[in-house]
Curated annotation (Swiss-Prot):
One of its GO terms (cellular component) is membrane. Its main location: membrane. Keywords: Membrane, Transmembrane, Transmembrane helix. The chain crosses the membrane at residues 20-40. This is Small integral membrane protein 3. The gene is Smim3. It is a single-pass membrane protein. It comes from Mus musculus (Mouse). It comes from the Eukaryota. PANTHER family: SMALL INTEGRAL MEMBRANE PROTEIN 3.
Length: 60
């Protein structure tokens, strides 16, 4: 009877391909990469405009 009750428990818990920490690490790395891809072009434009138009940023 114990073997019958243990087999559905094993069927309920699936075997993960990766550990939970690896999945969380991949998700966090994806968020960091997507954020940098989103913010880096805007930062480059701001730096370019500050260098090419020095009157606007307060330099005389």
């Amino acid at each position: 009877m114990d073997a019958i009750t243990q087999s559905p428990v094993d069927a309920v818990l699936p075997k993960h391909i990766l550990d939970i920490w690896a999945i969380v690490l991949i998700i966090l790395a994806t968020i960091v990469i997507m954020t940098s891809l989103f913010l880096c072009p805007a930062t480059a434009v701001i730096i370019y405009r500050m260098r090419t138009h020095p009157v606007l940023n307060g330099a005389a």
